[in-house]
Design a protein with these regions (language model features):
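Non-catalytic alpha-helical scaffolds and adjoining flexible linkers that form interface surfaces
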Residues: 1-250
């Protein structure tokens, strides 16, 4: 059976001198793995459209146990990400998060596809700082994947106003000054600007998701919180994250 869809290539693997196995986040079928035959040759008609980070239209043969790409047409390559190793590493980290949070052939992934495409665009075009972009992506993909934290009111007493708050990754939410003593888990004191930013990353309209800024210190605080929450949710160390952080430090 032949099917068509658009999608972003989030991983590629060489399987012979001429063929690749690519992992695609598609609009219609979620994550699929498809064979791309002969595409390692520059003469192949699909060569330019099955590279890592390519957003393409695909015509795919769907068999009982495998997909094979028949035709593809690149809509956006994000090629300039390869010119900056820090941006390249961050883009690979974003793709790794998708692979860890989205099941193969999971349906209704349109918003996740939109998120990664918007994020790669902002990353490639230097629209916002890498640190802030990373935090927005982490919180939004967690929310879309079922890890929506409580950022509205205290997770203990439900107080929502006139309080100082802490974020506790282990309980998936915030607690107030009065209740924080009840928890021995690692916690992050929230300034008003960081709490606003956390809420914005989750609750803002999709087309306004990146339309805010923070001072450098607040960006650092937000980054520490979103990364800690992400690692708590995925419950594993991510080599792509470790590599990105090494680049940022150095």
């Amino acid at each position: 059976m032949q099917v068509s869809t658009d999608g972003l290539i989030i991983m590629e693997k060489s399987i012979s001198e001429s063929d690749k196995l690519v992992t695609i986040l598609t609009r219609k079928f979620g994550i699929i793995r498809a064979f791309a035959k002969g595409v390692k040759s520059v003469k192949n008609k699909n060569f330019s459209s099955v590279q890592l980070f390519c957003y393409s239209d695909f015509i795919i043969f769907k068999g009982r146990s495998k997909y094979i790409i028949n035709e593809s047409n690149c809509k956006k390559s994000f090629w300039n990400l390869r010119c900056d190793i820090e941006k390249l590493a961050l883009a690979q980290y974003f793709c790794d998060l998708i692979l860890n949070l989205v099941a193969e052939e999971q349906r209704h992934t349109e918003d996740i596809l939109r998120l990664i495409l918007n994020s790669l665009h902002y990353l490639a075009e230097n629209k916002i700082s890498n640190k802030l972009l990373k935090s927005v992506f982490e919180m939004r993909i967690l929310a879309l994947s079922g890890y929506m934290p409580n950022l509205v009111s205290c997770s203990c007493c439900e107080e929502s106003e006139n309080k100082s708050f802490y974020f506790i990754p282990e309980i998936n939410g915030i607690v107030c000054d009065d209740c924080v003593k009840n928890y021995s888990f690692a916690k992050f004191k929230l300034t008003s600007s960081v709490l606003y930013a956390l809420r914005y990353t989750i609750y803002s309209e999709f087309n306004r998701m990146f339309a805010f800024d923070l001072k450098q210190q607040s960006q650092a605080e937000l980054s520490a919180i979103t990364e800690a929450y992400l690692l708590r949710c995925v419950e594993k160390n991510l080599k792509t994250l470790d590599f990105y952080k090494q680049l940022v430090v150095n």
